Amino acid sequence: MMQELQRWIEDEETKRGYIRTKTPLMAKSDLYKISGHWDHYKDGMFVLGDEETDKEVFALRPMTCPFQYYVYKAEQHSYRDLPLRYGETSTLFRNEDSGEMHGLTRVRQFTISEGHLIVRPDQMVKEFKDCIALAQYCLQVLGVEEDVTYHLSKWDPNNREKYIGDAEVWNQTEAHIRQMLEELNIPFTEDVGEAAFYGPKVDINAKNVYGKEDTMIT
């Protein structure tokens, strides 16, 4: 079943212009320090080595974003090359506390489909809407599109140390996402403090058998 799902989503992403990547399962701590994960997500990572005693420290990847952005950085690009869409079926590792583990929705190793887009400002609206369309297509094919809720996950300005970037950029980005969701006529709630440390996001959630919402797509 996993192989069929992987083949299906990869074929669909390729049709939509995604470039397939295959990135390592771990990296030196240097990469995570550049991306901000070392300062803001280290407790959720499996770290290999000790910074005080070892010359090199590695960590298993908790997400693919630093790796795919490094793929982009490895070559020189013109603005004419954009948008660039990277897709990967990624096996990830997160050092979840035992009390946070839950069924197959909160585990320490899992495989998901990840995509990262490099776009010009004038391309942002179209690319965002195309991402939502891809998510909705997947939900429709899997037969769960009627059971989901949409959430604009925002930063908490009263907890600034949790995030990177300045307030103006955060507020502008949240306003752009809000406007695009409204243009798509998608009902959504706004959840303060649920953003990633690096930016706001749209979470697509579904209720499990216990009535608790789990995030299916971000």
PLM feature spans:
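TRNA-recognition modules of translation machinery and tRNA-sensing kinases, especially anticodon-binding
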Residues: 1-218
